[in-house]
Amino acid sequence: MCDTKDDAQKWKCETCTYENYPSSLKCTMCQASKPLLNEDIFRLSPAQESCTVAEEAAAVEVAVMSPTPSSTCYSLQPQSQARQSNVADSEKWPCKVCTYLNWPRSLRCVQCCTKRGGEAIERGKKDMDNEADGDRAGEALQALRISGSEENLANKPVQLIGATASHRLSLSRGIDDATHLNNLANASHNQSQSQHRQPVLQQQMQLQLQPQQQRESSSSAAVPPQQQKQCYVSKWACNSCTYENWPRSIKCSMCGKTREREISGSQNDLHASSSLNSQEENQQQLQQPNVDTVSVNNSFNKKHIYQLGSSETINNCDTLQERQERRQRQIRRQVDWQWLNACLGVVENNYSAVEAYLSCGGNPARSLTSTEIAALNRNSAFDVGHTLIHLAIRFHREEMLPMLLDQISGSGPGIKRVPSYVAPDLAADIRRHFANTLRLRKSGLPCHYVQKHATFALPAEIEELPIPIQEQLYDELLDRDAQKQLETPPPALNWSLEITARLSSRMFVLWNRSAGDCLLDSAMQATWGVFDRDNILRRALADTLHQCGHVFFTRWKEYEMLQASMLHFTLEDSQFEEDWSTLLSLAGQPGSSLEQLHIFALAHILRRPIIVYGVKYVKSFRGEDIGYARFEGVYLPLFWDQNFCTKSPIALGYTRGHFSALVPMEPFTRIDGRRDDVEDVTYLPLMDCELKLLPIHFLTQSEVGNEESMMRQWLDVCVTDGGLLVAQQKLSKRPLLVAQMLEEWLNHYRRIAQVITAPFIRRPQITHYSSDGDSDEE
């Protein structure tokens, strides 16, 4: 218990009623400020000054020696000891602001808190925060044994390390706050006097500052560099699990992996260099003459708190994020960047990147994996399993699709080898010949039309190939998925055994490009057996709709109004105009999908009916019905005269947004050149599997109900023995260019068949005779 003689002069705390010593500016129990209402602001006697300075020195000594200031009582030094060390007034230094004479060891003015030879320090609300931060930092430093052992603290009580320096600073700031209030009243009165004494005071300050700076440098130099080096915890990170291990650990504490010497050595060198740099910085600070003890220790404390904080941050770092970054770096080193650059080239429309990948023998059918998508780091643009063709279709790269599709020319599963790929020169000649057959009707309907008719069919010579070769041919020619989907119950194709078997009119689904040009490709395949790669048919379609728009718009609008009334809703004229402009723009854009109106216009360009067999419902990826397809039916060239058109139709198939050409197989008797029949006939059903007539599209209100009679007018209709209404498709002689293309295509498979079926010729065994006669007998 602290004893004192003047218990009657103690002041009572207004918060906790604890009686504090007169020199205490804050309550020892609750840290509440001392009430200053009863103080005399003009009391500036020498006795009070000496007492104040003595009390300040005692408070500083208590702050330095006590480890926890809140747990012990502040034992003040007796005032008699302070009076014994009185110094003459000539040795005191006056404050340049308030002219108060301060003791030589005081670094700041007791009255106005002005720094000795500098400006007033900041005061305010940060005192409590600094004190609390100092306590926490002091505990952390003591826990890590940064400030040394207890014996060192006992032998060197002047060392100001960690929380003691910050706590002493907070106490001095608390004393300065109280004295600053007393100075506000007479600051203006003393300001004029201080101006006259300024030159004399500056000389005294320079003389008194030299011994003070020596004491400050000696006190700050008491902190050895060994203690500074101990502040940095140099743990090493495991390369496998990223666990932070202690420096002396040979193996990882988590996974048991041996520490790599090269990495650890580099880390130790790094920590050693950082510690040496910190020692050099401390030596430079100690050599500077104008640095006070408080600022040196505060900077020392803050620096080591930052180092400890950084080590704690390393120990508690987000290991998941580091593992992901490390995994991405490994992926970037292992993946094929030429392939990934090609994928990015399709997305970013970089033609050269795709061309560079294909020129080096890259496979256009290669699909993306999850690892490669992680390396690309663009999940919104790429999906697992996507190829360059998928990306080109998704991002509408119409100029890249022909190049990618041309690369699909090898053999193997999923690789297509259509006749136009085997004989590209002949296919180009066929497209050029077709372009020359297009004409424009000048009188009447200004519509493009073809001058010659052709119908494509698979050659009968396929039956002469071996069965394995036939299977390979069909795999590389047909679209098996579309064929299966059209024949799946309820079937839309080859559902009548009478038509397929007895009448030999089975239809095959040809593969074509999976793009928005599939309708035009299928129309060209059904007639000439090639793709519309030069967009000849698309340009003719766009020109026809623009030049004959007034004729097509009237019938299209009436048909759409009729379909809307069947679904019990109506459309406004503005909606019709908007939809019509959309249809016109789609016709002129290569790669864009086409609608029913475009099939109706194609029937006029080809001058023949078009029969579409398709699914009735559009399904999602999960197999759920999401809407009506409405493409199945008969499209007649109603704007032409019947005598101007042929009655031999072509057949197309529709499956979930994709059109395919439906072609028959030529009868085997066609190979015989002595036959009398010039044309072969294929029978196309005009009824569905439920024996209902196929709808005729774009009929007016007056024409509805006369579907069968209109079919008989525009088609060669007959009825089978089973009562099915069918249309006759005439197969005439092949055009010369088409025959040459098919012959070259068949020769490819004939060569494969010869290699497989050729007999194995064994080499004759040659007998070698020795020159020795005895060995010959043996």
Swiss-Prot record:
What changes when the gene is disrupted? Flies are viable and fertile, suggesting functional redundancy.
EC annotation from Swiss-Prot or TrEMBL: 3.4.19.12
Positions carrying Phosphoserine:
770-771, 775
Q: Name one GO cellular component term.
A: nucleus
- Disulfide pattern: none
Tell me the first and last residues of the signal peptide.
none
Q: Which CDD domains match?
A: OTU_ZRANB1 (cd22767)
**What residue spans carry the region label Disordered?**
187-226, 265-290
UniProt GO BP: cell migration; cytoskeleton organization; negative regulation of peptidoglycan recognition protein signaling pathway; positive regulation of canonical Wnt signaling pathway; positive regulation of Wnt signaling pathway; protein deubiquitination involved in ubiquitin-dependent protein catabolic process; protein K63-linked deubiquitination; Wnt signaling pathway
Tell me the function of this protein.
Positive regulator of the Wnt signaling pathway. Specifically cleaves 'Lys-63'-linked ubiquitin chains. May act by deubiquitinating APC protein, a negative regulator of Wnt-mediated transcription. Required for an efficient wg response, but not for other signaling responses, in the eye.
Entry's family note: Belongs to the peptidase C64 family.
Q: What is known of its domains?
A: The OTU domain mediates the deubiquitinating activity.
Q: Which protein are we looking at?
A: Ubiquitin thioesterase trabid
* Organism the protein comes from: Drosophila melanogaster (Fruit fly)
- Taxonomic classification, please? Eukaryota, Metazoa, Ecdysozoa, Arthropoda, Hexapoda
